[in-house]
Amino acid sequence: MTRSVWLKADDAVGDWEARKRRITAGLEAGVDWVLVDERDVSRVRELGQVNVAAFAGDDVHVMDAEEQPDAEPDAVIVGKEGEGDGTVDLPSDFSGSADLTTLRRAEAPAGAYVRILDQDYESFAETAAVDADYTIVIGDDWQIIPLENLIARIGDETDLIAGVQTAEEAETAFETLELGADAVLLDTDNPDEIRATVEARDATERETLDLQRATVTEIEETGSADRVCVDTASMLEHDEGMLVGSMSRGLFFVHAETADSPYVASRPFRVNAGAVHAYVRTPDGGTKYLAELSSGDEVQVVDTDGNTREAIVGRAKIEKRPMFRIEAELENGDRIETLLQNAETIKVATDEGRRSVTELEAGDELLIYYEDVARHFGEAVEESIIEK
């Protein structure tokens, strides 16, 4: 499931300048959607590239794209100043609902906006979800139980979006009933909360890897090869690096160049990852050859505890350098290997801490990631492949 963050920026926020500040903070943080009133759609388009949803006015007909394409929202949301938010009383029979009728007649992708004031509004949200592409539910005195009920009952019929005001509430919404909400609608002016909510979204998509130890059985100089430095567009932490190796089933943890050295300045955005043939792990759980990497690609950054995040490649620098071949054995007897540059600045994670490859000896234990699968074009396949 891909989560998303919506940012509420309608007239309830304030005048256009107040709304603009909120939207700008959202764009800078990386929100996925902005929810505004219809009249602000083109204004949002001018501020940056983002999905724009608009509350429906009296007429939900979307303007002809040839007349004013920037004014057409990506989704129309029904329920503000109607039955959904309690402005108009709910009908006893939902078949007579004006909001639901409007929702069904909408020409664009459409969503429902419902404040959960009591169980009747829960039922109304469930009914709306049958026809809605998006179902936004707001709890004024928010409780987990209504959200759990809706997650359990609605299923995959719609994208369920929970209204929140803080990043902490967003984390809870994303984790409720393990499945969690598909998205959150954030209502805050605080740039820190907006950034933290986006980070909470990203965290739900990230995997935690089960790293293990392998014992060095052999290390030897091999001569020169084409080596790849992966220069990311992110500053990496001292305990972070990448997973690389000659064999897709077993990847070695190689530290980023965050440590000071008497020989060269630190490069905390860089991982000296190995030879061009080697695999590097990507955020989707796949692999790429180091030789394939280019500016704009995504690679997976991992720390020594197995926590992961994404980084954009700014540059892949290939140069001919002297190399070591490192072989290590796992507890199951399988042996894996890789080529790393023969230089003091390239460090791996051992059982005794960070160590330069020039100081490695047989018997040292290295941090690695192992999965007993074969790969074809970077994707795991159920096939017998011999790598040696």
Curated annotation (Swiss-Prot):
What catalytic reaction does the record list?
A: 2-amino-2,3,7-trideoxy-D-lyxo-hept-6-ulosonate + NAD(+) + H2O = 3-dehydroquinate + NH4(+) + NADH + H(+)
- Molecular-function GO terms, alphabetical: 3-dehydroquinate synthase activity; dehydroquinate synthase activity; NAD binding
Class of enzymatic activity (EC top level): oxidoreductase
Q: InterPro entries in the record, alphabetically? A: DHQ_synth
Q: Which EC number(s) are documented for this chain? A: 1.4.1.24
General function of this protein? Catalyzes the oxidative deamination and cyclization of 2-amino-3,7-dideoxy-D-threo-hept-6-ulosonic acid (ADH) to yield 3-dehydroquinate (DHQ), which is fed into the canonical shikimic pathway of aromatic amino acid biosynthesis.
The name under which this protein is listed is 3-dehydroquinate synthase
Can you name the source organism? Natronomonas pharaonis (strain ATCC 35678 / DSM 2160 / CIP 103997 / JCM 8858 / NBRC 14720 / NCIMB 2260 / Gabara) (Halobacterium pharaonis)
